[in-house]
Every structure is written in structure tokens, then in C-alpha cells.
Regions:
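Short, acidic loop-to-helix structural element flanking the phosphoryl-transfer center
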Residues: 13-42, 52, 79
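Alpha-helix N-cap and coil->helix boundary residues
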Residues: 2-6, 21-25, 59
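Short, basic/glycine-rich phosphate-binding loops at helix/coil junctions
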Residues: 2-12, 62-65
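Conserved phosphate-coupling serine/threonine residues in phosphotransfer and NTP-handling enzymes
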Residues: 44-46
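Asp-based, Mg2+/Mn2+-dependent phosphohydrolase catalytic module
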Residues: 48, 52-147
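Generic surface-pattern signal
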Residues: 8-17, 87, 144
Length: 147
């Protein structure tokens, strides 16, 4: 087993053992957005097993219509995978993320973007964002300002 597989297996085990946490307010905000009629699509650079364990542990299927993982697309850049998402789910988009990879989607496709300043990214990665939020509970209002 290569190092990446070992790390993934350990991360999946820890999530399954209850060692992972969502940011405070995440489930309430996701439910609020879903109830408001927004279609939520998940796109991540994470490994598929890691994503699936989060789905199972936190019941993310309750909120998201679909899940896309870069591993399933040969680790193509998110902005390329997004083309597939647009075909599968036509409509308007607001890109929400905590890393420059997320903001690249918005930049390359001419879409509004919200940077999550409470996530893993650094402030210098957020230069293309229309909005920067410091807490997920700010998300509904930020989306409202962009749509």
C-alpha cells in the first residue's frame, strides 16, 4: 500500500470512529439552503473514500444532490470537472469554497464566488472572491447579495 493509500485509510477510519467534526452551524445552514430551494452540489479534491465516509458519517445526502470528487476524474482541475456539473445540473451558480481551486472555478467560468475564511485556505487565496465569510452562518446572506 502506498503512502497516500495509508493516509486515506487512516483518515477514513478516524472519520468513522467519530473523530471528524463539521464546523458549528453547518447542518442547520445546509438545511436552510436546501429548504430555500437551492440545489447543492459537492465538488472536492479529496479522495473518493474520504468523501464517501463523510457522506455516511454526517448524512450529507440529506443536503447535497450530487457529489463529485477529483479522484474520479483523474485529479483533473476543479474548473474542468465543473463543466460536467454544468451539463448534469444546468442553472445559475454561486461557487463556495475555502481554497484557490474553488475560486478558479468562478474565475474561469465567470461566476460569483464566496470564500470561506473559516476553512483551510489562506487569505491570499481569496483575491477573486465576491464575498468572504468568517462563519458558515453568514452564508445565506452572502448568497442573497450575489443572486
Amino acid at each position: 500500500m502506498d503512502a497516500s493509500a495509508v493516509v486515506t485509510a487512516e483518515m477514513v477510519r478516524r472519520i468513522a470512529d467519530g473523530q471528524a467534526r463539521l464546523f458549528p452551524g453547518t447542518e442547520e445552514i445546509l438545511q436552510q439552503l436546501k429548504n430555500a430551494g437551492y440545489r447543492l452540489i459537492f465538488l472536492s479534491n479529496c479522495k473518493t473514500a474520504y468523501m464517501k465516509q463523510h457522506q455516511a458519517t454526517f448524512g450529507l445526502d440529506r443536503y447535497f444532490e450530487d457529489f463529485y470528487c477529483s479522484e474520479d476524474y483523474g485529479y483533473a482541475p476543479k474548473y474542468e470537472i465543473f463543466i460536467r456539473i454544468q451539463k448534469d445540473y444546468p442553472g445559475s451558480y454561486v461557487i463556495i469554497g475555502d481554497r484557490f481551486h474553488d475560486l478558479q472555478i468562478a474565475e474561469k467560468h465567470g461566476l460569483p464566488a464566496i470564500a470561506c475564511g473559516y476553512g483551510y485556505g489562506r487569505e491570499d487565496e481569496f483575491c477573486g472572491a465576491n464575498e468572504i465569510i468568517k462563519d458558515i452562518r453568514e452564508l445565506p446572506e452572502a448568497i442573497g447579495r450575489l443572486l
